[in-house]
């Protein structure tokens, strides 16, 4: 998970770990890409607006790597152009997009749909 909002990262981590998922987290796109290259993840949850490297740059970089993780892009906070950047994220290869704020159950539903058999055990 890559998001510069530590409170949100914590809430998402708690929900995902409670559902049985292992969670890696980074506060910016640069650190997140490094973590993905070192640890790898089946699914990457990425915020669009982050310091260092934004979510669109991260998605471009992840699409160039092997193996390609499943990507869920998120954005919110009432930012101008939020829908447009999520559409851009989808065009770049994000499998799904989420508008913040969202309920943990919404995120879990998306993850289960995307990972299918690779879901948490």
Tell me the role of every PLM-derived stretch.
Residues 1-7, 12-16, 44:
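Conserved acidic segment of CheY-like receiver
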Residues 28-31, 54-58:
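Acidic catalytic/metal-coordinating carboxylates
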Residues 50:
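Receiver (REC) domain active-site loop signature in two-component systems and cognate sites
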Residues 74-76:
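Hydrophobic/aromatic residues positioned on beta-strands within the core alpha/beta folds
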């Amino acid at each position: 998970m890559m998001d510069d909002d530590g409170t949100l990262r914590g809430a998402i981590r708690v929900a995902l770990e409670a559902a049985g998922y292992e969670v890696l987290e980074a506060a910016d796109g640069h650190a997140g890409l490094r973590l993905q290259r070192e640890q790898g993840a089946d699914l990457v949850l990425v915020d669009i607006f982050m310091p260092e490297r934004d979510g669109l740059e991260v998605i471009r970089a992840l699409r160039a790597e092997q193996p390609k993780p499943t990507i869920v892009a998120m954005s919110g906070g009432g930012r101008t152009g939020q829908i447009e950047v999520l559409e851009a994220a989808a065009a770049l290869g994000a499998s799904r997009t989420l508008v913040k704020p969202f309920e943990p159950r919404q995120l879990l539903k998306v993850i289960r749909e995307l990972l299918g058999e690779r879901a948490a055990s």
